[in-house]
């Protein structure tokens, strides 16, 4: 659950939630779209996009233009 009163930025909180879902095997394959994440978690699309960008930069997911974001199965994360 995202908490706007925490000092941690919302995009980092969302990234942590998604990372946890991936680590627990709850999120595999395709990651929900930016729009879906924004609606589901009650944040702006820019916040959801920033969360996915952070996970991409960490190697947790890969983003393919025109196709979406996917859990990185290569083990590089």
Stretches found by the model and what they are:
Residues 1-43, 49-62, 73-77:
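Extreme N-terminal segment that seeds HTH/winged-HTH DNA-binding domains in transcriptional regulators
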Residues 67-73:
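Minor-groove-contacting beta-hairpin "wing" of winged helix-turn-helix DNA-binding domains
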């Amino acid at each position: 659950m995202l908490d706007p009163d925490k000092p941690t930025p919302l995009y980092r909180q969302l990234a942590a939630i998604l990372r946890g879902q991936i680590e627990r095997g709850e999120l595999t394959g395709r990651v929900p779209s930016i729009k879906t994440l924004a609606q589901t978690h009650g944040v702006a699309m820019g916040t959801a996009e920033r969360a996915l960008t952070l996970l991409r930069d960490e190697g947790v997911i890969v983003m393919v233009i025109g196709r979406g974001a996917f859990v990185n199965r290569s083990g590089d994360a």
